Amino acid sequence: MKTYRIACIPGDGIGKEVVPAGQEVLQALAAAGANFRFEFTSFDWGGDYYRAHGKMMPDDGLEPLRDKDAILFGSAGDPHIPDHITLWGLRLKICQGFDQYANVRPTRILPGIDGPLKRCTAADLDWIIVRENSEGEYAGVGGRAHQGHPNEVATDVSVMTRSGVERIMRFAFKLAQSRPRKLLTVVTKSNAQRHAMVMWDEIALQISREFPDVKWDKELVDACTARMVNRPASLDTLVATNLHADILSDLAAALAGSLGIAPTGNIDPERRYPSMFEPIHGSAFDIMGKGLANPIGTFWSCVMMLEHLGESEAAARLMRAIESVTADKSLHTGDLGGSATTVQVTEAVCRRLKS
């Protein structure tokens, strides 16, 4: 029997509640006749670790993750620690250290969930947003000088490389090719950013020639936000820079009903390193410890993890269980207008996996 070694990093806030819920659901799936099992290793990194050690994770923290088949992550963020420390000290350290250059965020309106767009049906909103996850606006290049003085200066430099853009474009075109509509929208801002984004556009055109069966178009990022709201059915697969996709994918999750249901995968397509899967919601300290967190985003992230591991049948089974639960409005958590608890939603998914 195959054993998948999964690193679990709950992180901060409600991450400490939804990651154990994800483990419980994966164990229930494995126990329900699957031909594999899971071996979980938990890492207590995050804000509490920072308070004890002055860093979000150990300096050599990537090493115990390196031999794992995948990483299940919760959330990063602590109201008592600057955001740039919590993000760069943990999540981005893993993403960049393992060259997880493709961030993939599927968005659908799940059964039983009401999206805010009154003329948008579930069939109209079925997207995947591909985010360049290794460079661009989050390359980490920049600095500050003359801090505290009137002439203080600070820079954050967006860095794009030909190799980095080529590989994310090729990944996005290949993903679009695998979907029924074979449709890709390349998000840009080359009208105002006339160097790196122009190169981005040129490389998109170049890579498109490798995929003659994929229909593609180009959309300015500001216009894309309006298109997502006004013409959602015109979109299918999107590819955007690190910052642009970060913003667009949160809008996408909101249009699908809640950030609490949205998953993401930080993927190393070449499989040199473990990929990392996580819900996109934040640490939500306001509801931490109250049992109110929506675990659906974590469960859907587990579906993505199973697909990445090649367990497509098990992934489909878990997704059916998730959709059966969201279809029952008595099992909606507060972010969806209900009063169900994390435990109730988790137990309901586990019951459906066992039945």
Model-derived regions: residue spans:
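Glycine-rich phosphate/nucleotide-binding loop
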Residues: G47-Y49, V104, R227-S330
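Glycine-rich phosphate/pyrophosphate-binding loop and the adjoining helix
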Residues: G140-V186, S190-R194, S312, R317, ...
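N-terminal beta-loop-helix "entrance" segment that forms/cooperates
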Residues: N35-D59, M228
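Short acidic loop-to-helix transition motifs that present clustered carboxylates
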Residues: G112, E219-A226
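Buried hydrophobic packing segments
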Residues: G22, L26, A204, T298-L306, ...
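Glycine-rich phosphate/diphosphate-binding loop of Rossmann-like nucleotide-binding domains
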Residues: A7-E24, L29, G33, H149-V221
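N-terminal glycine-rich phosphate/adenylate-binding segment common to multiple enzyme folds
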Residues: Y50-T155, L243
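Buried hydrophobic positions in well-ordered alpha/beta secondary-structure cores of metabolic enzymes
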Residues: D12-G15, D69, V130, A172, ...
